[in-house]
Amino acid sequence: MTQASLAPQADLTSLLVGKALAVKPLWALAKAQARRMMIGRAERLGIPWRETVAELSQRDWQPLWDQVFREGVDLPANYRASFHGYDAGHLCWEAAYEFEVASNAVHSSLYPEAGAHSDQVLRQGYHELLQQQFPQAPARILDLHSTVGLSTFRLEQAFPSATITGLDFSPYYLTLAAYNAAQKGSAVDAWVHALPEATGLADGSFDLVSAFLLFHEMPQGTTRRIFREVRRLLPPGGCFAFMDMNPASGAYQTMPAFVMTLLKSTEPFMDAYFGLDLRQELLAAGFDEVQIQPCTPRHHAVIARVRV
């Protein structure tokens, strides 16, 4: 949605909503109300939000934290920004505890028939698309944004013979990912605490690098650095795939201005992402072929390849 496409009244409404949200007490009130509504919706769908958070918050996470945390990961300011209504963004236990239940609640509007399992359906669709891209399954896979392991475990199911590495910049998420892996009996090879633009992994060490809902949370400069880093990690014939918001989707093009403003208040780099020409940026980063295709009413899948 461009600024020019907004009607004057919608533009004014958006401006007023934005100004109201900039007032901290009003933002806190709006955030608390939105949170209550989200939890209520989740629990009506059978998603045990409060029960899950209560159970996870009682655990001693120090041993797993010590396993995944890596000293020296210097997080730039954009990684410490507020996201999704959490003041500490992705760098807090609350975000980690609530990640899976919140994902199912948010994506239930896309797959209402799936109810409490809507996020699984969303990820499964993306990974089925990936399977179609590989006549021969990739042997070495990197999940560039593991969070608590949801996309990593789906990659493991889609490509059971592959060696899979999960990476994330948030040690809170990775601690939960390691826990979830143990609960599921997962054979994920390693959990890596690193920035996606500075992984520290070897050149050409993966046949497939995948990222799920990462780039709408990144400034443009960071996205460009990530693209270059991924290109470094891929050998000839390697593939980079990601799923993210589709700016051309009718869901965003027709979204009421005040709703879009509310959404952007929890996604500080969404405008930056919507302004990127992904195809041109990937070609500039050294990829040879780029395919972009819608895969849900709100998302697209991007496949970028390196020639053999």
Predicted features, each with a name:
Residues 11-98:
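N-terminal auxiliary segments of SAM/dcSAM-dependent transferases
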Residues 140-198:
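Class I SAM-dependent methyltransferase SAM/SAH-binding core
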Residues 197-209:
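A short acidic, Gly/Pro-enriched loop at the edge of an enzyme's catalytic core
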Residues 224-236:
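A short glycine-rich, Lys/Arg-flanked "PGG" loop and its adjoining helix->strand segment in the class I
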Residues 302-308:
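C-terminal lobe and adjacent flexible extensions of AdoMet/dcAdoMet transferase-like proteins
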